[in-house]
Swiss-Prot record:
<keyword id="KW-0964">Secreted</keyword>
<comment type="subunit">
    <text>Monomer.</text>
</comment>
<comment type="function">
    <text>Salivary chemokine-binding protein which shows chemokine neutralizing activity and binds to host chemokines CXCL1, CXCL2, CXCL3, CXCL5, CXCL6 and CXCL8. Binds to CXCL8 with 1:1 stoichiometry. Disrupts CXCL8 homodimer formation, disrupts the glycosaminoglycan-binding site of CXCL8 and inhibits the interaction of CXCL8 with CXCR2.</text>
</comment>
<keyword id="KW-1015">Disulfide bond</keyword>
<feature type="disulfide bond">
    <location>
        <begin position="46"/>
        <end position="59"/>
    </location>
</feature>
<feature type="glycosylation site" description="N-linked (GlcNAc...) asparagine">
    <location>
        <position position="45"/>
    </location>
</feature>
<keyword id="KW-0732">Signal</keyword>
<dbReference type="GO" id="GO:1900137">
    <property type="term" value="P:negative regulation of chemokine activity"/>
</dbReference>
<feature type="disulfide bond">
    <location>
        <begin position="53"/>
        <end position="70"/>
    </location>
</feature>
<feature type="glycosylation site" description="N-linked (GlcNAc...) asparagine">
    <location>
        <position position="76"/>
    </location>
</feature>
<dbReference type="GO" id="GO:0090074">
    <property type="term" value="P:negative regulation of protein homodimerization activity"/>
</dbReference>
<keyword id="KW-0325">Glycoprotein</keyword>
<dbReference type="GO" id="GO:0019958">
    <property type="term" value="F:C-X-C chemokine binding"/>
</dbReference>
<feature type="disulfide bond">
    <location>
        <begin position="42"/>
        <end position="57"/>
    </location>
</feature>
<protein>
    <recommendedName>
        <fullName>Evasin-3</fullName>
    </recommendedName>
</protein>
<feature type="signal peptide">
    <location>
        <begin position="1"/>
        <end position="20"/>
    </location>
</feature>
<dbReference type="GO" id="GO:0005576">
    <property type="term" value="C:extracellular region"/>
</dbReference>
Length: 86
C-alpha cells in the first residue's frame, strides 16, 4: 500500500509540476486518515543523476526529462515514525 501511495504521489507531483500547478506546499491525506503528509518544494531545480537537492529532498522528474525540481515529503506514513521538519 505504501509503495502504491508513493507512486501516486510522485505521479501527482510530476503532472502538477509540468502544468505549473505545484505551489510551495501540497497536502495529502489518505481516506482513512492513516497517512497525513505534505510535499514541500525545496526551492531548487535539479538534474537527473546528480546530487543537487538539499539533504532530505529528492529530484522529481517529468517523463524522460533530465531537469526537474527538488521536493521533500514531511509527515506520517502508515507504520512509519513521523518525519520531523528541519
Amino acid at each position: 500500500m505504501r509503495a502504491l501511495l508513493a507512486r501516486l504521489l510522485l505521479c501527482v507531483l510530476v503532472v502538477s509540476d509540468s502544468k505549473g500547478l505545484v505551489s510551495t506546499i501540497e497536502s495529502r491525506t489518505s481516506g482513512d486518515g492513516a497517512d497525513n503528509f505534505d510535499v514541500v518544494s525545496c526551492n531548487k531545480n535539479c538534474t537527473s543523476g546528480q546530487n543537487e537537492c538539499p539533504e532530505g529532498c529528492f529530484c522529481g522528474l517529468l517523463g524522460q526529462n533530465k531537469k526537474g525540481h527538488c521536493y521533500k515529503i514531511i509527515g506520517n506514513l502508515s507504520g512509519e515514525p513521523p518525519v520531523v521538519r528541519r
